[in-house]
Amino acid sequence: MDYYQWRKKNRGKKRNLQAKKPLNYALRLLKYRVRFEDELRERLKKQGFADEEVESTITTLKKQGYLDDEKAAYLFALDEMRLKLFGPRVVKMKLKSLGVDEEIIERAIEKALEEIDFHEELKRLKGRFKDRWELRDYLYRRGFDSSLIEEILNKIDGGEE
């Protein structure tokens, strides 16, 4: 057997051995995006790792700072609100479905709301709608509370006059 046949035969064997380790697999998943603890636990179990291995991996990642539900929830809320223009109600539902703790969700949404300026985002949106009511309905469907909608619309209307 020459070198090229041997290489073809053994291609990926070392890679597969590395992929079998739960910590390496978890780090590979975290390389692409921030993940929640429950989400990572499910992925590791689905991959076939034992419960003890999964828990020790998650503990290790928490100690090293790679796994932080609070930071992940904040970044998720910020992206959903700023980029996709979802309101706090929809973001809360999405985070609950991902298995995030209620307290963490509340803190993340509060922190994200402090940082986001919806007025600038919605000024651009206003041109798409015929009147104020259409924009109000759109925002309500996107998960904004009626009091927040009124506050935002009043600031937008007041800023243009």
UniProtKB/Swiss-Prot annotation:
It is found in: Cytoplasm. The keyword Cytoplasm applies. It holds the Pfam family RecX_HTH2. GO terms for biological process: regulation of DNA repair. Keywords: Cytoplasm. One of its GO terms (cellular component) is cytoplasm. The keyword Cytoplasm applies. Modulates RecA activity. Belongs to the RecX family. This is Regulatory protein RecX.
